[in-house]
């Protein structure tokens, strides 16, 4: 995070610098299947309503590190009591583990500032990614905030244990789409990008209907024959730390149009408002959309909820679309 400050050392504005091999704005590609060895490119997705959206190849700020596996092993340790000579042998067992291949920042609804990513440790638990700062370490706050105060404190996650990070009774419906004045609606209305949208130049938050092509009828579904994926079991989702979804909409339950290839959504986890801690890394890839408090749940083993709504204080991923 790079910030400009005034004479009193107060942050006036800040920017998130994403250092990656991903190049935004290149022509979209059609890939039959996801290959983690390739840099992801934008993909053209058709939703249930027949509207096309060009999704970024991965969520904002995603850093891929490759998959590291640790096999199960055991080590015997012998202890000898110096005075009596008694010997005790114990066996230390290391269970197999997979270290998270990547991570991405989370965003509270309507904020431009990234919240600290989560990642899996060697035991498989979701933990905070290491953070290096000079006086601005990431922290959690039980307080609510105004828009202005949140800009001055981009390192603070507001609204822990509170369903809204906005102070008072205010609801800012248009933070991520300037013309939107609605809540919990799903449509293909044009998104008017705002200064609070964290997306790179040329991209913005998706319209609230953008994900409906990922189930056979555009609604919340579970089961591999009901969601638009080549996966038939949990194996690939576990290995890839994410889910592939077909870009062309389904032709019916269990019927797929594979001609458009797949688009990948990372399971980088989330920060729900209840505790503000990262959770479900390697399991969940919930993404925000532009309409107030709307998101799409993409979760292992086989859940896609294109028309979901949740607390604005929770922090989820952002996988934007082309303007």
Regions found by a protein language model. Give the residues of each.
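C-terminal, surface-exposed recognition/capping segments
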Residues: 146-323
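Short, compositionally biased
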Residues: 3-193, 291, 295-296, 308-314, ...
């Amino acid at each position: 995070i790079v910030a400009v400050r005034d004479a009193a050392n107060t942050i006036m504005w800040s920017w998130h610098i994403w250092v990656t091999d991903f190049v935004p704005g290149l022509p979209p590609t059609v890939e039959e299947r996801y290959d983690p060895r390739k840099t992801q490119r934008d993909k053209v997705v058709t939703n249930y309503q027949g509207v096309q959206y060009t999704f970024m190849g991965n969520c904002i700020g995603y850093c891929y590190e490759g998959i590291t596996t640790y096999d199960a092993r055991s080590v015997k340790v012998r202890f000898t009591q110096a005075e009596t000579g008694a010997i005790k042998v114990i066996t230390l067992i290391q269970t197999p583990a997979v270290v998270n291949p990547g991570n991405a920042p989370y965003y509270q609804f309507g904020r431009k500032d990234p919240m600290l990513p989560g990642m899996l440790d060697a035991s498989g638990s979701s933990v905070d990614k290491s953070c290096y700062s000079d006086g601005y370490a990431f922290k959690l706050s039980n307080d609510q905030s105004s828009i202005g105060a949140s800009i001055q404190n981009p390192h603070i996650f507001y609204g822990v244990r509170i369903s809204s990070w906005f102070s008072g009774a205010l609801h800012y419906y248009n933070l991520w789409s300037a013309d939107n004045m609605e809540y919990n609606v799903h449509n293909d209305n044009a998104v008017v990008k705002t200064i609070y949208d964290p997306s790179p130049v040329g991209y913005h938050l998706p319209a609230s209907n953008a994900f409906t092509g990922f189930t056979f009828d555009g609604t919340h579904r579970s089961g591999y024959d009901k969601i638009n994926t080549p996966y038939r079991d949990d194996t690939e989702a576990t290995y890839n730390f994410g889910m592939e979804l077909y870009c062309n909409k389904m032709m019916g339950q269990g019927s797929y149009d594979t001609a458009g290839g797949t688009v990948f959504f990372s399971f980088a986890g989330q920060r729900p408002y209840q505790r503000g801690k990262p959770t479900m890394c390697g399991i969940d890839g919930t993404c925000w959309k532009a309409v107030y408090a709307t998101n799409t749940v993409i979760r292992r083993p086989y859940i896609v909820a294109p028309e979901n709504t949740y607390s604005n204080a929770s922090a989820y991923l952002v996988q934007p679309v082309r303007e």
